[in-house]
Amino acid sequence: MKCPYCGYPDSKVIDSRPTDDNTSIRRRRECLKCGKRFTTYEKVEQLPILVIKKDNRREVYDRDKILKGMIKACEKRPVPIKVLEEITDEIDKRIINSMEREITSTEIGEMVMEKLKNVDEVAYVRFASVYRQFKDINTFMDELKKLLKESETKKENA
C-alpha cells in the first residue's frame, strides 16, 4: 500500500480488525521508508444498485441524495444533522441488505417520509410536497389533514 506521506510503495500491516458493523477490515499500517503510520479499510466491492426514477430512467444509487433531500426539508428546523445521518444510515442499510440490484425512487421516498414523520412533521410535509409533487392545494391539504389525524391519534394513545 502506497504511503500517503512520502509516496513509498510498500508498507507493513501492524494491526487488523473488523469494524464495529463488521462490513470492512481496518488495517493499521507503517511505511517501510518514513516510518509514519496510517489506516486503511478493506471492503467487499459491491455491485451498484440502480434507482428506477419515475420516468423509468435508471441511475446509480447515491446515499448522499437521501441526506441532501432531508437536509433541505429540515432547513431552519431544530433537527440535528446527526439524526439525519442516522436516518440515512438506516435507510442505506435497508436498501443494501435487501440484496436487490434495483429499487424505485418511490420506495426510497416512502422510507424517508416514514422516518421524517417521526422526527419533524414540518420537515415531513416539506419533503412530501416535493417528493409527491402535489398537483394542487387540495391534495396538499389532504396530506396535512391525514398527518394531523395521525398526530391526534398518537396523543390520545399516549
UniProtKB/Swiss-Prot annotation:
The keyword Transcription applies. Keywords: ATP-binding, DNA-binding, Metal-binding, Nucleotide-binding, Repressor, Transcription, Transcription regulation, Zinc, Zinc-finger. This is Transcriptional repressor NrdR. HAMAP family: NrdR. Residues 49-139 form the ATP-cone domain. The gene is nrdR. Negatively regulates transcription of bacterial ribonucleotide reductase nrd genes and operons by binding to NrdR-boxes. Belongs to the NrdR family. Binds 1 zinc ion. Pfam families: ATP-cone, Zn_ribbon_NrdR. Coiled coil: none annotated. The lineage of its organism: Bacteria, Bacillati, Bacillota, Clostridia, Thermoanaerobacterales. A zinc finger (unnamed) spans 3-34. Its cofactor is Zn(2+).
